[in-house]
A protein has these predicted regions:
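Carbohydrate-active catalytic/glycan-binding domains of CAZyme proteins
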Residues: 1-112
Length: 112
């Protein structure tokens, strides 16, 4: 067995959510105010990762107009059940002191 070194994804990949589907592993990470929304990486060995896409590419899924620095998508959660991937994510529109203006969403897909 090969030794896995942290971080498993080099660079800026906050709030990782990992799911295993058969022999495949997928990680979803936050993108904050950056478009397109949420990064998805894939691996079969937890060592070699490849960016396979951005699931949120339409305004109807992710409207980032008006969000400021460090706002936008926070902490996506990627799961899989009975042949369907589920991605839950929060869009932080604004935050002031201890007050957050957020919206939560769910998107589904049969494959990634």
């Amino acid at each position: 067995m090969k030794e896995i070194q942290n971080p498993i994804l080099r660079g800026f990949h906050p709030d990782p959510s990992i799911v295993r589907v058969g022999r495949d592993y997928y990680i979803a990470t936050s993108t904050f105010e950056w478009w397109p929304g949420v990064r998805i990486h894939h691996s079969r060995d937890l060592i070699h990762w490849r960016l396979i896409g951005y699931p949120l590419t339409r305004i109807s899924q992710l409207d980032l107009r008006g969000v400021g620095p460090s706002q936008g998508i926070w902490a996506p959660c990627l799961t899989w059940n009975d042949g369907t991937f589920y991605l839950v994510y929060t869009v932080v529109k604004a935050f002031y002191c201890n007050m957050y203006d957020t919206e939560n969403y769910l998107v589904t897909a049969q494959d990634i």
